[in-house]
Amino acid sequence: MKKGYVQVTDSYERILHWMLALSCLLLCVTGLGMMFQTFNFIGLLFGGLKSLKLVHNFTGLVFAVSLILVIRMWWKEAGVFVLPEDLDWCMAAGGYLWHVDKVPETGKYNPGQKAFFLVVAGGGILMILTGLIMWFPTTLPVELVRWMYPLHALGFVAIFAFFFIHLYLGTIGNPGSVDAMVTGWMDKKVLTMLHPKWVKEMEHEGKLVVYGEEKKSDAHGHS
């Protein structure tokens, strides 16, 4: 680890992030193999349609557990918009779509990241509930079960659309930020540029962990 890097995530956060991401990706692939004839070849890779459905269903359970834990873990920081700062950031589009002299400062997660989190949370819950009903279709009237398929697809479309934006902004769009979910550490310069308010708050509270530096004392003199 390089000197001057800041710890932004712990191992628990990273494990849950990748459990959710990989299970979601596998659900997308297996789901496409079941929904569209064009992607029937995916079923062959898993040993047939029956095996594909089993993989999809049990991956859904992993996704459900991961999502519940992720919502519980990140809701306070990523699930609530803070006004007026988040609105100011949105009005400036975070500086991504046009030039702004100064991007409004936000907390650990900006409104774009919060929006993605809420879409994944809402779309994920929708897919879990509809998926369970589709798994056990005899539990409800046929007319109601039929509605589960388009609703399930709606959750997929919402998450999949935001996924590519998240992937771009987490890699090419913000070089260096991918380290947060790989090693748990980010270059302090990059972090300060992307989340200056959070860095200031953590420094003020004495909670900022910088590799190669001793933890600073907080305002009350505790380390």
What are these regions (language model features)?
Residues M1-S223:
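Membrane-embedded alpha-helical bundles that constitute the cytochrome b-like, heme-associated redox core
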